[in-house]
Amino acid sequence: MIDRYKHQQLRIGSVSPQQISAWANKILPNGEIIGEVTKPYTFHYKTNKPEKDGLFCERIFGPIKSGICACGNYRVIGDEKDDPKFCEQCGVEFVDSRIRRYQMGYIKLACPVTHVWYLKRLPSYIANLLDKPLKELEGLVYCDFSFARPIEKKPTFLRLRGSFEYEIQSWKYSIPLFFTTQGFDTFRNREISTGAGAIREQLDDLDLRIIIDYSLVEWKELGEEGPTGNEWEDRKIGRRKDFLVRRMELAKHFIRTNIEPEWMVLCLLPVLPPELRPIIQIDGGKLMSSDINELYRRVIYRNNTLTDLLTTSRSTPGELVMCQEKLVQEAVDTLLDNGIRGQPMRDGHNKVYKSFSDVIEGKEGRFRETLLGKRVDYSGRSVIVVGPSLSLHQCGLPREIAIELFQTFLIRGLIRQHLASNIGVAKSQIREKEPIVWEILQEVMRGHPVLLNRAPTLHRLGIQAFQPILVEGRAICLHPLVRKGFNADFDGDQMAVHVPLSLEAQSEARLLMFSHMNLLSPAIGDPISVPTQDMLIGLYVLTSGNRRGICANRYNPCNRRNYQNERIDDNNYRYTKEKEPFFCNSYDAIGAYRHKRINLYSPLWLRWQLDQRLIASKEAPIEVHYESLGTYHEIYGHYLIVRSVKKEIPCIYIRTTVGHISLYREIEEAIQGFCRACSYET
């Protein structure tokens, strides 16, 4: 349905019998009303055409072929001539065959039938409204015992108003035998009620507002009593109070949605459109049918049998009628939810029939498979791995996935740049994976974000936008900082990638869904892009060099032997820890590390900017090195000061490692990038 704001929505609930008939009924030009399915047949075995008034009737559900009736006559759909809309011979409407996807029918039940979802599902809505135990209601619905029916302002023979017959044990077996005697039909119908009809009468007599008032009064009385001191009694009172709250909420829901309680008992059973329960012909002429068709046939067979028994009620024993009503109830239960009452119904191959509940519920049901989690175009899925070289807003997309997702954009780019004359030539170039294809693909991807989603999407950070980058392999590369938002781990987790097509979707992805714009948790406001797991280990490895300073390392007698043995040999350079190298800038230090002249933890001296805090420090140097030109080096625990002959300070060196330098450069670049972004916004 579509609301006043033009939002498409789906509402599931009870409907009245009048609404069910309005969905299905059609009036022919001769005044005949069609819509009721009365025959359990599907297709005629000779003509292979739908049976009239059957489960695939063209009069009820529409033509199989657009504009062609059952007689074979053809008429243009939407023709403005004054030709009749229905065929005069067969009564089939000249409409599009797609009507068979939504045109419904109905089965007029010979007796009321309780909807098993409202009776057997927990909590039982019928039991809550009637304030009766579920076991008693089940016995009444399935004709295991009877109910004394009070007639308004008239005394009954039993004088039992609203009580179950089992309450009087001496009458438990005598009442059914007495009132099912032949010739007592009128008397029996006046005094005894059983089956779903008894439930319907009680639901029809309910006043929901009175239920709310009485339940509220009882709840207050129980609350005022206080604890009794008996644990069992206190639990019983607590359960009763919880039940009263659920009962009031249920009654309010019925009032708010304009649903009558008696609608939970069916008089008309809706029949699904034929296209939703198809019969398909496979190789060899064999037919494959939906299980729902067989369950519908079972209902129609039993309902027609009950109708025949009721039309000849004078010669039919009452117990036989009650047993047939029970069979109709069980057939409808199997159609709606097979196996809810115990042993499910099976076919000849011992396979359980799929009921209506099985079709719509679960991971492979109608909602989750075809509406909520259905397969969509321009999407793919792969395993995620760490992409340490990526920016926060980037993701690595495998070439194999990218060339499929962006194929239409790639074809357009090849044709626009006159690299392909038509679509066929462009597809041929893509299949051959020519070098120009990858260049055009990179241009297409440069301004087109993609969406990454990890199921289950429990909050809005479960799907975020990224700028795709082509990578080798078959795994999607992801920045480790966005892992927490997706609640993902790099141990085999899979993620889906989607391509937003419209300009509106791309704008929304850029403005609202980019990963670098979702740094805080929407629930509590804490930072969600924080280093964890591998990143913490990496930070520890980068900064795990000796931090005890030169005094503890060089002059510790326990470590002096290690200094003699620990060295890095290279063809052009020889370094020992007793001779720590000097570097003018961080680029030289990282270059030496990449050429394997020093390792990640090797202490070194890095020239640093003059710092007044170090110059003004009153710390005494550990040692002083004098040079021949008169300059000298004052060596401290973590830094070194170079002084001239005039005691001026031309430069300062700090003692660090390549790991510390790399971490500092990353932090510095991040701060500079943030400052540039802030300056652009202002």
Swiss-Prot record:
GO CC aspect terms: chloroplast; DNA-directed RNA polymerase complex; mitochondrion
UniProt xrefs under SMART domains: RPOLA_N (SM00663)
Binding site for Zn(2+): C69, C71, C87, C90
Similarity comment: family membership: Belongs to the RNA polymerase beta' chain family. RpoC1 subfamily.
PANTHER family given in the database record: DNA-DIRECTED RNA POLYMERASE, DNA-DIRECTED RNA POLYMERASE SUBUNIT BETA
Subunit structure: In plastids the minimal PEP RNA polymerase catalytic core is composed of four subunits: alpha, beta, beta', and beta''. When a (nuclear-encoded) sigma factor is associated with the core the holoenzyme is formed, which can initiate transcription.
Record-given protein name: DNA-directed RNA polymerase subunit beta'
